[in-house]
Regions:
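Surface polyanion/phosphate-binding segment centered on an Asp-His-Pro turn
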Residues: 62-70, 100-102, 127-129, 164-167, ...
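A conserved non-catalytic segment of reverse transcriptases
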Residues: 198-201, 214, 378, 658, ...
Length: 1023
């Protein structure tokens, strides 16, 4: 609590940015009054009601803190006798339904004239004093500092001129029911104010927070004394343990580093704390001395010097907290730093479990019981389960691709120090370390000192097939998911692993990742380079569109595996790797880092005992996603090869499953046998892999001709739910119609943008800062939708942009036009985003994917229904209005919009054609018959593609006889041939070279012409 804060509405956001938590203000002016209550970001709380004085005199809260509800009041009383003020405050506090009350502040009066005041006039009790005393008696309130220091003569305010006066004007009144919860109450000298601070320490929540585990203070890494100490420690430890094996030596080095780091930090803290105590005592001594007699000039100088020194130390400590809170970003020009853009997430995540439901009727809050239950839960979860032998399951399958000999050789090369150094360089900073407390920053600073010992430890581990003791250990930290947080299943376990383990895991992951791109079907888009999450979403739209167009009854099956990463069986992973012919050496390396793995659970700073792991891939390990998708590819192969499952056949390719890591969707015709076979396939896979279907979250959605019906088949799996939508797939809520899906998802984006704007509107940002937030934070809510959904309506785009503009100008009059805002800064704009342009640029990226990937995987519908292949289509000179000519079937809306955008960017009018002879004849909006572009498959199949293919070497046209001689397999008549020749513009016939190609008039956020050129030049030319 602060009083006489001089806060105003203009300074509010500055204070909040610096504090990092929540502040409830009652503003005064910049020169008078103002009071507020600060709530630390880590304190779990809920404000039920707040009463705020408009004149800056009080803030009164009905608040729940750590599960305890109470009334909290910060008071700044007038400096005259104002009984009406105290009556008002009393009535407001008593109007709140709480019997626990804490009222603190500057009351501008003393309660006991004999103990709380010295000097000045000893008046009888004022009317205000009487009101306070009566209220204390009637409401069971006590002056807690006086209660704990009954005979102390300590004051919180002093006046030296014209009359020497000392008073205790600042105090806390608390309910007597809270006395047993008080840890301490003390007065500490002020150094920036004429008031001393009153500190009340109260333990509302009986939960005692543990010490947690040691983590290196990264500030030490910039301290030369610390660096020299650690270098010396490493050398001494190595000299003393020369005979130890490399693993034992490495662990010993880490233990020695930890010991010296703790010692260094403790010494620094002890020295600082000792100096603070010394200065406080000196200030207190001089203050007490001044109550009896005026200080000499020398003593007055000592007092001011002590206050200045104390202020400096406190400021240094505050600066550390300030930096840790990431508030310094506001003073660094709102740079594009992750910590700046994480304000939305900061402090919003509940990180500890204070209550837990262990049965239908019992909720526990005792930390020991909670930790015990957590340990039992995760020990059981990660214990190996008896499963069916996977050999039978795998023997019925054939891998489409396996690791070849060349890949095996590359994958199993010996590790090198340079490879380790590269991995360390790539790893992200500012991440929580594992149990040894050493972050990645430590490895970078001391790399030259430790590299040989770390390298030898890895070599020894892989040779002996066992990591060092510390490398085997992980600390499970829990993050909340959706749902009831009293249930442990609604918390996600993230394992904090030691950095030396993560480096080795990353080295292995980097090697196998390259191979996975080759052996994993493109139906799996998770974690692999050149795979895109939106690919699955677009595929779902394509399948739904195909079923609609062909009146096909089908179902979309969304399967949820319960704790999929945590339950996957290790033996099944090894068997899966053998199935794909991974070399034994790499499998043994992975087995080595899993052998003897242990974890403990941390909660509220307490840590459980370590327990052994027997299954699951740890979330937090660089290898985990790749091991998981190797195992889940077995599921996909089994579904594709299962003849009882009837998928959707599009363009010769049958779609049965789409995957993103553990997120799986199956597709089947509306047929009982096929749907039952699908679920049985998932079930059989679970029997050998450990995966368990969560039927509560698994759904069947009707699509195609039955999308609006309530049809269902009587399945063998009774728990599965039927629906017409929505089904959430990778963040997109799918309904049975495109219109409903598109509208719903963009409306949800609008809600998220609104919520984010509410958060950011409280921050004091410059215009450039707001533009950064719009382009980075707000626009990010939209990007994934624009990338994989049909374009938003014009009205929706306008609504979104209006929200951005209102945020930019704080809902006030716009100072700059939108057209000017969208220009770049070199043209005096602000780079304000144009949603329509951003949408176009994101959809253009799909053109590159179509060209650089297996087109049949990206879009089997397009691949089957376009008249020409993608390589040819994207060289055709089509107008947007002629796009319909490229396919005999109606294009799905997403692809129609994407190809229209390409046409806008790519089309060149006749006078823009640079080399007419090189122009493609077909699907060319400059070459038409009967107002339609031309495409004659027979001619195209006989390599007649460009204008030059109908010309002689001297650039004159082939006559009909010459044409038939050159292309004997083309069966067209004389009239048809000459109609084609006559359709070619005269400019082409004259081989007139036009102007240099103009750049597209579209002001795309990326240069689409360059993008087009980049795409085209990466592919072989059409001959």
């Amino acid at each position: 609590m602060t009083q006489e804060a001089h806060s105003t509405k203009d300074t509010e956001s500055d204070w909040e940015n610096t504090w990092g938590g929540k502040i409830i203000f009652s503003h005064g002016t910049s020169a008078a009054r103002g009071t507020c209550i600060f709530i630390k970001s880590t304190v779990q709380h809920e404000v039920h009601k707040k009463i705020i004085d408009s004149d800056g005199r009080y803030v009164i809260l009905d608040i729940e803190i750590e599960g305890i509800r109470l009334t909290l009041a910060s008071i700044y009383a007038p400096n005259n006798d104002s009984p009406e003020f105290f009556i008002t405050v009393r009535n407001l506090i008593e109007s709140l339904p709480n019997d626990r009350r804490i009222s603190g502040g500057d009351y501008n009066l003393v309660l006991d004239l004999t103990k709380d005041k010295k000097g000045g006039q000893n008046k009888t009790k004022t009317k205000s004093q009487k009101i306070i005393c009566e209220w204390m008696n009637n409401a069971d309130l006590i002056d807690i500092w006086r209660h704990m220091h009954p005979d102390s003569l300590t004051y919180t305010w002093s006046q030296k001129r014209p009359t020497r006066v000392f008073c205790r004007l600042d105090f806390f009144l608390i309910s007597t029911s809270l006395v047993d919860d008080i840890v301490s109450a003390k007065i500490v000298p002020g150094f920036r104010s004429d008031h001393s601070a009153v500190i009340l320490e109260i333990k509302l929540n009986k939960t005692i927070r543990g010490r947690g585990y040691w983590k290196l203070n990264c500030n030490h890494l910039s301290n030369l004394e610390y660096i020299n100490t650690i270098k010396r420690t490493i050398n001494e430890t190595v000299q003393m343990n020369k005979e130890s094996n490399p693993n034992l030596l490495w662990d010993t080095i880490k233990i020695a580093i930890r010991g010296e780091s703790i010692k260094f930090g403790a010494t620094q803290k002890k020295e600082i704390d000792k100096e603070i105590v010394r200065l406080e005592k000196e200030i207190q001594r001089l203050n007490e001395l001044s109550t009896n007699t005026p200080l000499s000039d020398t003593d007055e100088g000592y007092l001011q010097s002590a206050k200045t020194s104390l202020c400096t130390i406190i400021n240094q400590k505050a600066q550390g907290a300030y930096v840790r809170s990431r508030a310094e970003n506001y003073e660094e020009g709102e740079k594009n730093k992750s910590s700046f853009f994480n304000i939305e997430k900061r402090n919003s995540t509940k990180k500890s479990v204070n209550k837990l439901r262990i049965s239908k009727t019992e909720v526990i809050s005792d930390q020991n019981r909670i930790l015990d239950h957590m340990k039992t839960f995760y020990k059981t979860l990660y214990s190996q389960k008896k499963l069916e032998n996977s050999n039978t399951f795998l023997s019925n399958l054939s891998p489409p691709k396996t690791v070849n000999e060349e890949q095996s050789i590359i994958m199993t090369k010996d590790l090198t120090i340079d490879e380790i150094a590269a991995a360390i360089k790539e790893m992200k900073s500012n991440k929580s370390p594992g149990e040894d407390g050493l972050p990645i920053e430590f490895y970078r600073i001391f790399w030259e000192d430790i590299k040989i010992y770390l390298f030898e430890s890895y070599k020894f581990s892989l040779q002996e097939k066992s990591l060092s003791i510390t490398q085997k250990r992980g600390v499970i930290s829990l993050l909340p998911k959706k749902g009831d947080l009293l249930m442990l299943k609604n918390w996600r376990p993230l394992t904090l692993l030691n950095v030396d383990y993560k480096i080795l895991a990353k080295l292995i992951a980097t090697r196998i990742k390259k191979v996975l791109l080759y052996i994993i079907n493109e139906d799996q888009t998770g974690f692999l380079p050149k795979r895109f999450i939106g690919q699955n979403i677009v595929s779902m739209f394509e399948i739904m569109n195909f079923c609609d167009e062909n009146e096909l009854a089908a179902v979309l099956i969304s399967i949820d595996f319960e704790k999929a990463f945590d339950q996957i069986d290790w033996d099944f992973i090894w068997d899966s790797m053998n199935f794909f012919k991974f070399p034994p050496k790499i499998i043994n390396w992975i087995k080595t880092i899993y052998k003897g793995a242990q974890s403990c659970v941390t909660n509220n700073g307490h840590m459980s005992e370590y327990f052994a792991l027997g299954r699951g891939v740890r979330q937090g390990c660089p290898l985990s996603p790749y091991l998981f998708i190797i195992a889940s590819e077995i599921l996909a192969i089994s579904l594709r090869s299962n003849e009882l499952i009837k998928g959707i056949l599009i363009g010769g390719k049958e779609s049965k499953i789409k995957q993103f890591a553990d997120d799986s969707q199956a597709i089947s015709i509306f047929d009982k046998e096929s749907i039952n076979a699908t679920f049985k396939n998932f079930e059989d896979y679970g029997k050998v892999s450990g995966s368990v279907i969560n039927f509560d979250k698994s759904k069947l959605m009707r699509i195609g001709s039955i999308k609006d019906s309530l049809f269902a088949v009587d399945l063998d799996y009774k728990d599965v739910k039927w629906t017409n939508g929505p089904i959430e797939i990778l963040g997109i809520n799918f309904y049975s119609t495109f219109e409903e899906t598109t509208k719903y998802n963009y409306e949800k984006v609008l809600e998220k943008i609104d919520k984010a704007i509410q958060t950011w509107s409280t921050q004091k940002l410059t215009l450039f800062g707001k533009i950064s937030v719009i382009n980075t934070v707000l626009l990010s809510k939209l990007i994934s939708k624009l990338s994989s959904l049909p374009s938003p309506s014009t009205d929706m785009i306008k609504r979104i942009e209006n929200k951005f503009i209102d945020f930019l100008w704080s809902s006030k009059r716009h100072a700059i036009s939108k057209e000017m805002l969208t220009k770049n800064r070199s043209n005096f704009g602000l780079n304000f985003p144009c949603i329509a342009t951003k949408d176009k640029s994101l959809k253009m990226a799909w053109i590159k994917r179509l060209l650089n990937s297996d087109a049949d995987c990206v879009s089997p519908f397009l691949n089957a229904n376009l008249k020409v292949g993608f390589d040819t289509l994207f060289r055709c000179n089509l107008k947007k209005s002629d796009l319909k000519d490229c396919s005999d079937s109606q294009l799905p809306l997403f692809w129609k919009q994407t190809l229209e955008i390409w046409c806008e960017a790519n089309y060149r009018s006749i006078d823009q054609i640079e080399n007419p002879n090189e122009e493609i004849l077909w699907l060319n909006s400059n070459i038409k018959l009967d107002h339609k572009t031309i495409f004659i498959k027979e001619m195209f199949d006989n390599n007649i593609v460009r204008v030059k293919d109908l010309q002689k070497d001297d650039k004159t046209w082939l006559n009909f006889d010459s044409f038939r001689t050159k292309y004997p397999n083309v069966k067209i008549n004389f009239l048809h041939y000459h109609r084609i020749i006559n359709a070619i513009p005269i400019e082409y016939k004259n081989n007139r070279k036009g102007n240099d190609p103009k750049k597209t008039a579209l002001a795309f956020s990326l240069c689409l012409k360059k993008f087009q050129k980049l795409i085209i030049t990466t592919h072989k030319p059409i001959t």
